[in-house]
Amino acid sequence: MRISIIGPPLPIPPVGWGAVESLIWDMKLSLEKMGHEVQILNDPDPNKMFQLMSEFSPDFVHINYDDWIPLYPHIPYPCACTTHFAYLNINRRHLMGPYKQRVFDMFSLIKPVVFGLSESINTTYQYIAGISPDKLFLNPNGVMADNFRVTEEIPTHLCRSLYLAKIDHRKRQFLFQDIKDLYYAGNIADDRFDQSKNYLGEWEKEYLYQNLTEYGNLVLLSDGEAHPLVCLEAFAAGLGVVISEFATANLNVDKDFITVIPEDRIHDISFIEGEILRNRYYSVNHRKEILDYSKQFEWCRILSDYYLPNIEKVINGKIK
């Protein structure tokens, strides 16, 4: 199959960090490994992208960048859209801000086929944007598990938990800086964050792949998420996760190595510290269980179980 993936007008793979660009690149590598041909379109000029698309003559086009949604009606091939916006949840739509008019209202107008990263995202498109359920397909993110080293020894930082994310308002890291064993890695975009407290700097990707496994568990207590890649990366490195209720997409929250902090307890630092400690103790002692769980999120599995069957349904059903 020939697939064109439309991404943001940025380098793919990314030079540094860039979750969407990394996801697109990992999808390409995994699809090609499975025998498919993949074209990445990330030119800032839509006319140039249409020219390249026409020359490639894809069987399917996948728009993976919100601001290119207006291209959808003009694409003469079977097509679907995926958005990575953090607040696409019926109960969080009041946080959309300018995104609503710029992007979400375009979904309401165009009503495209959607490959949603979670069921809650698809529910939002159905009930708020008015998109028919037969145009909504679940399509979770995947992870390149083979990129991650997994230690078979006692982790170097056995008693540390790691908050690995861009340090910003949505991720809320500054709230938890009184938790003594919680460390932070990521570029800083929030002046409320105190760099003198357990800050590890910004990690390069290769450093992440080699060193994530040396921590006890991962923390992600943001106030909005789509399907956070960092949780899948944690599992691939053998770590359990402590997450907010907005970061639970596609996860089995009954697992003992997945701890969900209710939003009404997000300011209860003593409670959160206790939950992080409990999760860390369990996770360090049950790494094989976590690694087994992580296999369902490997890209080749996600593509085989969701992505390619979804494409076939769109093509065969002539859904547009």
Model features per residue range: what roles?
Residues 19, 270-319:
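A charged, aromatic-enriched C-terminal amphipathic alpha-helix characteristic of glycosyltransferases
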Residues 223:
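Aromatic "clamp/platform" in nucleotide-sugar-dependent glycosyltransferases that forms part
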Residues 87, 94-115:
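Membrane-proximal helix-turn-helix segments that form the acceptor-binding/catalytic region
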Residues 105-135, 145:
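A short, active-site helix/loop in glycosyltransferases that binds the activated sugar's phosphate group
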Residues 91-92, 126-127, 135-159:
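Acidic anion/phosphate-binding donor-loop and adjacent secondary structure
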Residues 240-244, 250:
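Short hydrophobic beta-strand element within catalytic cores of glycosyltransferases
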Residues 3-4, 60-63, 72-93, 115, ...:
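Active-site proximal beta-strand in glycosyltransferases
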Residues 115, 153-171, 177-181:
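Conserved donor-binding/catalytic core segment of Leloir-type glycosyltransferases
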